[in-house]
């Protein structure tokens, strides 16, 4: 299993690792700060530097069948099993997604608290987030974005910690995605925005809501009866 450094610290930009296995263009390391994507969030990109000092681009990161994290590399350099590497993530890309990710938790929490609305689908890229909600009224989503921006200004420190599954399941509304079953893993990573939201979540987040900046509504689409899709980004 690959040690996932981002689970404890989303702000690791560079790390040292060792090549455990190579499968074609994919490299498995003993540890990584690259997020493999998941939960609607895009994967990280960046590069590895081998022992010769060659810079090798990482163009895709994904989770393998055995829980290992696979780093897809280009052919501008060579790697060998047991070779030490230095990994660097594309921080600008990652940090924008962190801001959008935390913003999406605030929006989802407000939707659930005010209207009992659940997310029925979503995706976060560096450019924007899109979420599907089971709500009837477009104005509801505009209201949520405005209220989320007021919460962001409150300068709230996030808490990230780990709980046994049985203990985590006792937290009300720990899963806010419609149709999503609680994960079967024994230890859950909990992301809490005190007074606002608490969720089981495996992705990178900012430390403080003020880092989000401002949520900017891009558009709202009808996606069938009682379902709306909202697109938004963050600035600056």
Swiss-Prot record:
Pfam families: tRNA-synt_2c, tRNA_SAD. SMART domains: tRNA_SAD (SM00863). The keyword Metal-binding applies. Keywords: Cytoplasm, Metal-binding, Zinc. Its main location: cytoplasm. It is found in: Cytoplasm. Its cofactor is Zn(2+). Gene3D superfamilies: 2.40.30.130, Threonyl-trna Synthetase, Chain A, domain 2 (3.30.980.10). GO terms for biological process: alanyl-tRNA aminoacylation. One of its GO terms (cellular component) is cytoplasm. Binds 1 zinc ion per subunit. One of its GO terms (molecular function) is ATP binding. Zn(2+) binds at residues 101, 105, 205. InterPro entries: Ala-tRNA-synth_IIc_core, Ala-tRNA-synth_IIc_N, Alanyl-tRNA_Edit-Domain, Alanyl-tRNA_Editing_Enzymes, Thr/Ala-tRNA-synth_IIc_edit, Transl_B-barrel_sf, tRNA_SAD. The keyword Cytoplasm applies. NCBIfam families: a_tRNA_ed_AlaXM. Functions in trans to edit the amino acid moiety from incorrectly charged Ser-tRNA(Ala). Belongs to the class-II aminoacyl-tRNA synthetase family. Editing domain AlaX-M subfamily. This is Alanyl-tRNA editing protein AlaX-M. It comes from Saccharolobus solfataricus (strain ATCC 35092 / DSM 1617 / JCM 11322 / P2). The lineage of its organism: Archaea, Thermoproteota, Thermoprotei, Sulfolobales, Sulfolobaceae. The gene is alaXM.
